[in-house]
Amino acid sequence: MIHEDLFAGFDPAMVAAAARQRAADVKETRRAVAQKSANRHHMRRANAEATLAEILPARFADGESWHVATRGDIDALSYVRHILAGVSHLDHLLMSTWCIAKNDLTEISAWLDAGKIEQFDLYAGEIFPGSYGDEYEQMLSMCEAYGARLIVAKNHSKITLASNASEAYYLTVESSANVNTNPRIEQSTIHASRNLHAFYLEFFDGIKSIDKHSKTH
């Protein structure tokens, strides 16, 4: 129960409108809803990956941030699929994740083959070589075949950087979700900001791999 004193000084019409919107959101939790605020932040909810195309723009305007709360089959790679649908290609894709599945690496390989991605860098957690042996070997093969880079570190961050310099398009996805799909509730924010992209890129460029086999890639 929200105490009425919290809204003292606010326009009653705005408070009533917000309350109606909140009631509608609670009632229809299984349907994607949207709300736009004045500072160019956008909020979305999604229950399945197919919903992303309905609730997110094909391209993100510079300076916008889109906040997405999910409780379905959406992971970090879901956003990459959506981003790729709105550009000719990506010069660079960097993904930082605790873990990644074989089918995800296979899909990324197909994008590299098709020229949809020129350079792919994967930052994985220290468990990756030992606990995900097949995926680790697959990624090493991608390093040889495509010039991809694997950096193994004490990493638990979930960041995706995507860029197309010729289109001055720089995106950063901050997320709780790993690359591999799971049914858990996750939250993500997509930022169209060259400065934020550069901030994270500089940070990740400074990380050295602790894995002897991936150091040379």
Feature names for model-found ranges:
Residues 1-90, 113-115, 202:
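N-terminal localization/anchoring segments of enzymes in phospholipid and broader phosphate metabolism
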Residues 4-10, 93, 147-204:
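HKD (HxKxxxxD) catalytic microenvironment of the phospholipase D
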Residues 69-72, 97, 189:
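Generic alpha-helical structural element
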Residues 71, 123-125, 151-153:
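Conserved beta-strand termini and adjacent loop/short-helix elements that scaffold enzyme active sites
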Residues 76-145:
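Primarily the HKD phosphodiesterase
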Residues 112-116, 140-144, 167-169, 191-196, ...:
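Short, low-complexity, polar/charged sequence segments that are solvent-exposed and flexible
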